[in-house]
From Swiss-Prot:
Its EC number is 4.1.3.4. Its main location: mitochondrion. The keyword Metal-binding applies. This is Hydroxymethylglutaryl-CoA lyase, mitochondrial. A divalent metal cation binds at residues 177, 368, 370, 410. Pfam families: HMGL-like. It is found in: Mitochondrion matrix. InterPro entries: Aldolase_TIM (IPR013785), HMGL (IPR043594), PYR_CT (IPR000891). Involved in the catabolism of branched amino acids such as leucine. Pathway: Metabolic intermediate metabolism; (S)-3-hydroxy-3-methylglutaryl-CoA degradation; acetoacetate from (S)-3-hydroxy-3-methylglutaryl-CoA: step 1/1.
């Protein structure tokens, strides 16, 4: 019987939309109202051809707030729909209200310049969309937000949202970790533009390059030139990797204001990656940390192979905790825990984090997951639930360790931001600009964008444009 009500409701709505020009725009098929979600409502498609790619992504991406255009709606009636979980229907038409239907409809006329507020429920969160018809008419003052409402994650199951921080800092490692093992040398100008685009997207930290021997990583031989070009950028910190004192001195001479050091929880991997044992590497890094302190340069620590090693296999959490504590004691303000070969799952990540958090505060820790086995987002989620609020990621999913076979594929920054948006977590990152940056570098490298979110959103925009 309920299905009969749905069919009757559909029929009534079709007639209303067909016979009443004030209820829909003539350029939009009636069927469109019954196939789209609450985030795919008709939004003045006549403006779409003149919009840039980035504007389209911002206007139609899942986290974007998109005010209606009064020209597209003909200065007429605005339809609002509230999804409910009940089987009753509330409507002005009494006969229509008798039928069982899982959503209700109401209409009202908006005066030009009147503020419109709509609640859109999507992916377990509610966003308040506000805008004025006068402002949206000119497209000059549109503002897009990926933030949830003041209730935060109140619409998400407590089992998921429990312990998740309200704000997560994203550390972008694409220009360094993402490009370091590319076989074809990327021009310095492309690297510089990529960094500029990433900073423009709102990312607070963008790891720019590495002052390592060109013999080991020829892709980053232009480290000084890159730093010379980006040192004047405002809005983000631009740390560089320095494997030893010589690299640190070169970085400081090039104007670096923050550096990073790289240790391993695996003895075998330490020997193959930085050509020394764990203890030898820690001794080397104490020298770097001391020099950095003298120059008032902050030092970030990395620990690789925190759950598994390509040579030794599983790594004990106690070994990870030991290395992390050593880096913390020598002065690292933040330590990033890297699953270098992407073998970790929540089942192995949680014990590792428990061991590390027993010796170092959670707010001093970051996570750095590779998506080799498709586990990165799941691992990030459990890390957030345990109190971690700093996540490393790479634009378009670029990169991996050149010394770890099969480790290609850092988790894509776009995918991380998309997931965090869905959780109601703030990042201050513009997803549209982020996707544009990923498309830029992917096009230059001649490969598809490795971000699933970016590919899906780009595909949806293309599909919407084809309907015009």
């Amino acid at each position: 019987m309920q299905w009969n009500g749905v069919r009757r409701a559909h029929s009534i709505w079709c007639k209303r939309l067909t016979n009443n020009t004030h209820l829909h725009h003539p350029s939009i098929p009636v069927s469109h109202f019954f196939t789209m979600s609450s985030l795919e409502e008709p939004l003045s498609f006549d403006k779409l051809p003149s919009m840039s790619t980035m504007d389209r992504i911002q206007r139609f991406s899942s986290g974007a707030c998109r005010p209606r255009d009064d020209v597209g709606m003909g200065h007429r009636w605005i339809e609002g729909r509230d999804c409910t979980t009940s089987n009753s229907c509330i409507d002005d038409d009494k006969s229509f209200a008798k039928e069982s239907f899982p959503w209700r409809r109401h209409t009202r006329k908006l005066s030009e310049g009147e503020h419109m507020f709509r609640n859109i429920s999507f992916a377990g969160r509610t966003s308040t969309v506000s805008g004025t018809l006068r402002e949206s008419k000119s497209f000059k003052e549109q503002k897009y937000s990926t933030f949830s409402n003041e209730n935060g994650t109140s619409h998400i199951s407590n089992k998921i949202s429990k312990g998740i921080p309200k704000f997560v800092k994203i550390v972008e490692v694409g220009p360094r970790d993402g490009l370091q093992n590319e076989k074809n040398i990327v021009p310095t100008s492309v690297k510089v533009e990529l960094i500029q685009r990433l900073v423009s997207s709102g990312l607070p930290v963008v790891e720019a390059t590495s002052f390592v021997s060109p013999k080991w990583v020829p892709q980053l031989a232009d480290a000084k030139d890159v730093m010379d070009a980006v040192n004047t950028l405002d809005g983000a910190r631009l740390p560089v990797l320095t494997p030893n004192l010589k690299g640190f001195q070169a970085a400081v001479s090039a104007g670096a204001k923050e550096v990073a050091i790289f240790a391993s929880a695996s003895e075998s991997f330490s020997l193959s990656n930085i050509n020394c044992t764990i203890e030898e590497s820690l001794l080397r890094y104490r020298v770097v940390a001391t020099a950095a302190k003298e120059h008032s340069v902050p030092v970030r620590g990395y620990v690789s192979c925190v759950v598994g090693c390509p040579v030794e296999g599983p790594v004990l959490p106690s070994k990870v905790a030991y290395v992390v504590k050593e880096l913390y004691d020598m002065g690292c303000f933040e330590i990033s825990l890297g699953d270098t070969i992407g073998i970790g799952t929540p089942g192995s990540v949680v014990p590792m984090l428990e061991a590390v958090m027993a010796v170092v505060p959670a707010d001093k820790l970051a996570v750095h997951f590779h998506d080799t086995y498709g586990q990165a987002l799941a691992n990030i989620l459990v890390s957030l639930q345990m109190g971690i609020s700093i996540v490393d990621s790479s634009i378009a999913g670029l990169g991996g360790c050149p010394y770890a076979k099969g480790a290609s594929g850092n988790v894509a920054t776009e995918d991380v931001v998309y997931m965090l948006n869905g959780l109601g977590v703030h990042t201050n990152v513009d997803l549209g600009k982020l996707i544009a940056a990923g498309d830029f570098i992917s096009k230059h490298l001649g490969r598809p964008n490795g971000s699933k979110a970016a590919v899906a959103l780009n595909r949806r925009i293309t599909a919407d444009a084809s309907k015009i």
